[in-house]
Swiss-Prot record:
Family: Belongs to the UPF0122 family.
The protein, known as: UPF0122 protein stu0888
Pfam families: UPF0122
Superkingdom of the source species: Bacteria
Family annotation (SUPFAM superfamilies): Sigma3 and sigma4 domains of RNA polymerase sigma factors
Organism of this sequence: Streptococcus thermophilus (strain ATCC BAA-250 / LMG 18311)
InterPro entries: RNA_pol_sigma_r3/r4-like, UPF0122, UPF0122_fam_protein, WH-like_DNA-bd_sf
Length: 110
């Protein structure tokens, strides 16, 4: 499995998991976060390996569709880069550093 794809799916899952069904959440989490094989997931849920594969592929598409429409992950990446740039450029400005920390904590809350 490609590391870049795994990282992206895990990130998209973090942003959009609440929009998925329980089965979609379980399969994606086991496959990408816990590194289960298709066979292990199939055995766990009493379904065929093909059923797991189909569900994961559909869910990947759903996650990508959510990102295309909502841009939550890509916006988070841009905000994080801007925060990092400000923190570096204005390292001596304690007020600005504090405000950036507050904004960052808003992005990172559950």
């Amino acid at each position: 499995m490609e590391i870049e794809k795994t990282n992206r799916m895990n990130a998209l899952f973090e942003f959009y998991a609440a929009l998925l069904t329980d089965k979609q959440m379980n399969y994606i989490e086991l496959y990408y976060a816990d590194d289960y094989s298709l066979a292990e997931i199939a055995e766990e849920f009493g379904v065929s390996r093909q059923a797991v594969y189909d569900n994961i592929k559909r869910t990947e598409k759903i996650l990508e569709d959510y990102e295309m429409k909502l841009h939550m992950y890509s916006d988070y990446i841009v905000r994080s880069q801007i925060f990092d740039d400000i923190m570096e450029k204005y390292a001596d400005d304690s007020y600005l550093q504090e405000q950036i920390a507050i904004l960052s904590s808003i992005d990172n809350r559950d």
